[in-house]
């Protein structure tokens, strides 16, 4: 989701006119990502944030784009300096940590937009939190080991991972690129 979302935000003006579009990711682009990621083979084995920033600087040279290659959890204070924080990682532990920081620093912390896919891309969701009088991410999933209060999918939806024997990545989530692009579009609209 993140690569498509970064592109759409840039095309919408994020990082222009004195603004900055910072991208953070601790993962590298792998072969199993190519079917559902903005970036292609020339960016394999590169940090996703750095590669995406380089790609966007080529496509949209007027933007100010920065990259953080590594876990944002090592430098969460950088989030406090943003106008909007967007978590499109799909990493629930990171989402909970960002939410906890945001709630603890209300009302001065920027709004946080959480975006993700459920059920092998069957549903996309986007939720923005920031107002102290309204729900936070944990309000939607009070039992962190359980199911969310408001499910996007029916309870009998089966989640599967498959073996991707064609490349070095042992597991992949089988959903098409259109799902990541749709989730990014939803998040861009909410942002």
Question: Which residues does each predicted region cover?
Answer:
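Hydrophobic/aromatic anchor residues within beta-strands of the central parallel beta-sheet
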Residues: 65-67, 112
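E1/E1-like adenylate-forming module used to activate ubiquitin-like modifiers
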Residues: 83-191
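Glycine-rich adenosine-cofactor-binding loop
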Residues: 1-30
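Phosphate/oxyanion-binding active-site loops and adjacent basic polyanion-contact surfaces
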Residues: 1-3, 41-49, 180-184
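Short amphipathic alpha-helical segments
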Residues: 6-10, 35-36, 97-100, 126
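Glycine-rich phosphate-binding loop and adjoining beta1-alpha1-beta2 segment
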Residues: 20-61
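Conserved SAM/SAH-binding loop
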Residues: 69-75
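A short, aliphatic-rich alpha-helical micro-motif
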Residues: 78-80
């Amino acid at each position: 989701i993140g690569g498509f979302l970064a592109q759409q935000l840039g095309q919408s003006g994020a990082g222009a006119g004195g603004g900055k579009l910072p991208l953070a990711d601790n993962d590298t682009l792998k072969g199993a990502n190519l079917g559902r990621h903005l970036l292609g083979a020339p960016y394999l084995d590169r940090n996703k944030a750095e590669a995406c920033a380089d790609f966007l600087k080529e496509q949209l040279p007027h933007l100010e784009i920065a990259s953080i290659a590594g876990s944002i959890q090592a430098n969460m204070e950088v989030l406090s300096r943003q106008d909007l924080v967007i978590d499109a990682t799909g990493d629930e532990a990171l989402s909970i940590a960002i939410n906890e920081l945001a709630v603890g620093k209300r009302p001065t912390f920027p709004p946080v937009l959480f975006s993700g896919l459920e059920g092998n891309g069957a549903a996309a969701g986007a939720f923005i939190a920031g107002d102290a009088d309204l729900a936070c991410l944990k309000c939607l999933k009070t039992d962190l080991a359980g199911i969310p209060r408001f499910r996007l999918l029916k309870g009998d939806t089966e989640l599967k991972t498959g073996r991707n024997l064609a490349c070095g990545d042992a597991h992949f989530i089988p959903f098409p690129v259109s799902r990541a692009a749709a989730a990014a579009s939803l998040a861009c609209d909410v942002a």
